[in-house]
Every structure is written in C-alpha cells, then in structure tokens.
Amino acid sequence: MALYRDEAVVLRTAKLGEADRIITLLTRDHGKVRAVAKGVRRTKSRFGARLEPFMRVDLLLGEGRTFDSVRQAESISAYAGGITGDYATYTAASAMCETAADLLPAEHEPAAAQYRLLIAALGALSRHLHDPQAIALSYILRAMSLAGWTIRLDSCVVCGSQDVEFFSASAGGAMCPNDHTPDAVRVPVHVFDQLRALEQGDWPQLDMLQTPDPRCENIVREWAQYYLERPIRSLRLLD
C-alpha cells in the first residue's frame, strides 16, 4: 500500500464499526480525501482529538481501494479550540466545512485554492476577527466562485444594466426591473451592497455592520442550494 503525506482540515467524521471513524478531509495537495482512522473512538487512541472537525493536521495516509487510512496525525492548528465554545462560531464553521465537503464531490483532485480559502476562514473564526455569520457567508460565496459558480451582483444577468433590484439564483444573480424573471425576489440596494462586500471579502466595510442583513443569508442559502442541489443544513442554524 502506497503511503503519502499531506496536510488537511477535518471536515466531518462518521462512525465505522465499534471503534473506527471515516474522516472526510480537505487536503492541501490531494483535494478531498476520505480515510479510515482505526481505533480513534477508543479512550486511549493514539490520535487523541487531532481528528475532530475543524482541526488542521499533518497526516501520513495509506492509499486504499474504497477509503484511504490514517497512519499518523500531528496537529498544525487547533482551530476547534477557538470555535467549539461559542454557538455562533461553531455553526458558522460547520456550515463552511459542510460546504467544502459538498463542493468537491470527486476525491483526490487537487484543490489548493479551496484549501487556502478554508484555512483562512477557519483561522479568522477561531480568532474571532469578524462576525461569524459574515465569515461563513463570505466563505460560501467565495468557495462557490472558485468552483465555477460566481454570483453576479453588480449588473443585470440579462442586459447588463446596473439598475438592479431583483435576484434570481436560477438566472445567475442580479436582475433589473425590465428583465427580472417570475421567480426573482426584490432586493434592497443595501443588501446588494452587503452581498458584494461578502463576495469580495471587504472586511473594513463588513466590520461596520453588527451582522449582515438576514436577506443576505437567505440569498446565499438559495444560491448554494440551487447549484449544489442540496441544502447546507448547518447554515439554517445561523438564523
């Protein structure tokens, strides 16, 4: 069995048998990887808490037919320590990791930009640099853009007019009064401004808000669900 070393963020875990877990990882060099950690649920497991969600770890993995296997794990950044103690921060991190896992359906396909974006967002969450909801919404929009689903917010997706008053996920983003589709929803100017700031990661502007307008979350949720073809369940907990 070939061995390889990589660093990774733990996205989610699932029980396997009596003592093992399947660990879903976003790695720096190999994209999404699912690996079995044997004995990790035992009290005296050699892995300790290093394979819990939100942890950034250096791993030695063995290639397998269905799942790879975790041979060694060393902590790089214990993001979980600054995340799990606060409900809003925890749910934001959960929404981000769920998005990362669902955005990358294929395994062992390099996704270095996605990895860098996720560790930056988790680092900001763990240090409480910005509003947790804003970090999560910004991450989701930017991760989806990296995956090829860039939301259009500055002009109408039909005619290019900058007089945008509506939004439609199925149409691709902002729409003007003349060309909006029946499913489009009316969006105030300040909500479009906040969405642009979230998509661009404009933290000086976002930090002036206590938290983004609730309609920003509704639009991000609709956008993600339409293109991922499934809801981000953790995102609903941010309400």
From Swiss-Prot:
Pfam families recorded for this chain?
A: RecO_C, RecO_N
What SUPFAM superfamilies does the entry give?
ArfGap/RecO-like zinc finger, Nucleic acid-binding proteins
Q: Name one GO biological process term.
A: DNA recombination
Please indicate which superkingdom the organism of origin belongs to: Bacteria
Kindly state which keywords UniProt assigns to this record, in alphabetical order: DNA damage, DNA recombination, DNA repair
Q: Name one GO cellular component term.
A: bacterial nucleoid
The cross-references to InterPro entries, in alphabetical order and at most eight, read: ARFGAP/RecO (IPR037278), DNA_rep/recomb_RecO_N (IPR022572), NA-bd_OB-fold (IPR012340), RecO (IPR003717), RecO_C (IPR042242)
Function (record text): Involved in DNA repair and RecF pathway recombination.
Which family, according to the similarity comment? Belongs to the RecO family.
UniProt name for this protein: DNA repair protein RecO
Organism of origin:
Bifidobacterium animalis subsp. lactis (strain AD011)
